[in-house]
């Protein structure tokens, strides 16, 4: 009887690892991935790309779609600029966060607010390859033919109150993020997909300037 229970549990665990994300299986070599990922990101000085965002809200039947531009420069400079359907800019630079919406600007110190500090780290971790070392999350690595999927489950209390999990999809060719998927406890989801990536191009300081 006990053997049958153990067998059922093992089968369930195996199926859960394979079926949770269609097309992906739990990686047998997460340490090898981590080493390759760290090596590739260490050689990446900058990234710029277009992005599209798809947001699904439990209160709305239609999805909200946005597009924009993305810039990152090693190791703590990032700009996310929404172009359509509205203008919105977020800049992270050396512990400061600037948010510009229309004519309104607001500058925040990430260190003065625990949530902003964690959000700042999440965004930087996603593009710099350090998310597997973030103590605020428990991670698992899944693998498909063309990409890896890093599943991050929040451990920090305030993040657990917001997110069920955050997934980062990594391209096997260059080990850069293809997509960031955020699943909130409320049932809302946000998926950001990156296209037309350019690696190690010169990005002027003005892109990340915070007055």
Would you name each region that the model predicts?
Residues 18-52, 56-61, 206-211:
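N-terminal leader/targeting segments and the immediate start of mature chains
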Residues 19, 108, 132-211:
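Gly/Pro-enriched, hydrophobic low-complexity segments
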Residues 1-4:
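Positively charged n-region of N-terminal signal peptides that target proteins for export
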Residues 51, 78-82, 97-100, 150-152, ...:
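Short hydrophobic/aromatic-rich beta-strand segments that constitute the beta-sheet cores
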Residues 41, 118-131:
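Short, solvent-exposed helix-to-loop capping segments enriched in aromatics
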Residues 69-118, 190:
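An acidic-aromatic
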Residues 9-18:
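Hydrophobic h-region of N-terminal signal peptides that target proteins for export
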Residues 67-69, 79, 87-89, 138-140, ...:
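Short, surface-exposed charged micro-motifs
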């Amino acid at each position: 009887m006990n053997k049958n229970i153990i067998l059922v549990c093992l089968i369930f665990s195996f199926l859960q690892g394979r079926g949770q994300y269609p097309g992906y299986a739990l990686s047998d070599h997460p340490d090898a991935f981590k080493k390759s990922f760290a090596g590739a990101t260490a050689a990446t000085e900058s990234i710029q790309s277009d992005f599209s965002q798809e947001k699904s809200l439990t209160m709305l039947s239609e999805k909200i779609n946005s597009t924009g531009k993305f810039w990152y420069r090693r190791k703590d400079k990032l700009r996310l600029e929404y172009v359509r359907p509205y203008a919105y800019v977020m800049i992270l630079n050396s512990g400061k966060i600037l948010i510009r919406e229309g004519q309104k600007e607001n500058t925040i110190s990430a260190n003065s607010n625990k949530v902003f500090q964690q959000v700042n780290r999440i965004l930087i971790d996603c593009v710099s390859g350090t998310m597997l070392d973030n103590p605020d999350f428990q991670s698992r690595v899944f693998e498909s033919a063309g990409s890896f999927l890093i599943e991050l489950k929040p451990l920090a209390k305030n993040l657990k109150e917001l997110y069920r999990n955050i997934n980062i999809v990594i391209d096997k060719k260059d080990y850069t993020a293809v997509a960031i998927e955020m699943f909130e406890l409320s049932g809302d989801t946000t998926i950001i997909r990156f296209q037309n990536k350019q690696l190690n191009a010169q990005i002027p300081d003005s892109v990340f300037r915070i007055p």
